[in-house]
Amino acid sequence: MMPKEEQVLKNLTMENANEENEKKDEKEQDANKGEPLALSLGAGEYCVPRGNRRRFRVRQPILHYRWDMTQRLGKPQARMREENIERIGEEMRQLMEKLREKQLSHSLRAVSTDPPHHEHNDEFCLMP
C-alpha cells in the first residue's frame, strides 16, 4: 500500500505545482497587459524599475491610424476634396481672367493712339 499512497501523493503534488505555475503565468500576463510603471525623476525624465524588464512593454504606435481614418471617413472626405478642388479651380480661372483683362488693357493702351480717358488736369508729361 505504501507505493500506491506515494504515487497518489506525487500526483497530487504535481497537480498542485501545475496549478500554481498556471496561476503565476496568468498573473504575469495580467501584469503585462497594464501600462508600464515609471518612476518620475523630475524634469520629464523617467526610469523603468529594475527587475523583470519583460513586464514593461512600450506601447506600439498605431501604424494604420491614418489609413483607418480614411477608410471610415473616406467617402465624405472625398466629396469635400472634390468640392474644394472645383471651388479652387473656379477661383483660379476667375483670377487668371482678371489678370488677362488687366494685362490686355495695359497693352492696348500702350499701342493705341488715343489719349488716356482719365482726366488729370494738374498732371503734366515731359515729352522729348
Curated annotation (Swiss-Prot):
Origin organism lineage: Eukaryota, Metazoa, Chordata, Craniata, Vertebrata
Family note: Belongs to the BEX family.
Protein residues bound to Zn(2+): C125
GO cellular component, one term: nucleus
Entry-linked Pfam families: BEX
GO MF terms held by the record: metal ion binding; molecular function inhibitor activity; signaling receptor binding
Statement: the UniProt record of this protein carries the keyword Zinc: yes
Native source organism of the sequence: Bos taurus
Basic and acidic residues: compositionally biased ranges: 20-33, 115-128
Compartments where located: Cytoplasm; Nucleus
Region listing for Disordered, in residue ranges: 1-44, 103-128
Domain notes: The histidine cluster (His cluster) and Cys-125 mediate zinc-binding.
Entry keyword set: Apoptosis, Cell cycle, Cytoplasm, Metal-binding, Methylation, Nucleus, Zinc
Residues carrying Omega-N-methylarginine: R50
Quaternary structure (record): Interacts with LMO2, possibly leading to regulate the transcriptional activity of a DNA-binding complex containing LMO2. Interacts with OMP.
Record has Zinc as a keyword: yes
Function text: Regulator of mitochondrial apoptosis and G1 cell cycle. Regulates the level of PP2A regulatory subunit B and PP2A phosphatase activity. In absence of reductive stress, acts as a pseudosubstrate for the CRL2(FEM1B) complex: associates with FEM1B via zinc, thereby preventing association between FEM1B and its substrates.
Gene: BEX2
Segments of this protein annotated with the region His cluster: 117-121
GO biological process, alphabetically ordered: apoptotic process; negative regulation of protein ubiquitination; signal transduction
Name of the protein described by the UniProt record: Protein BEX2
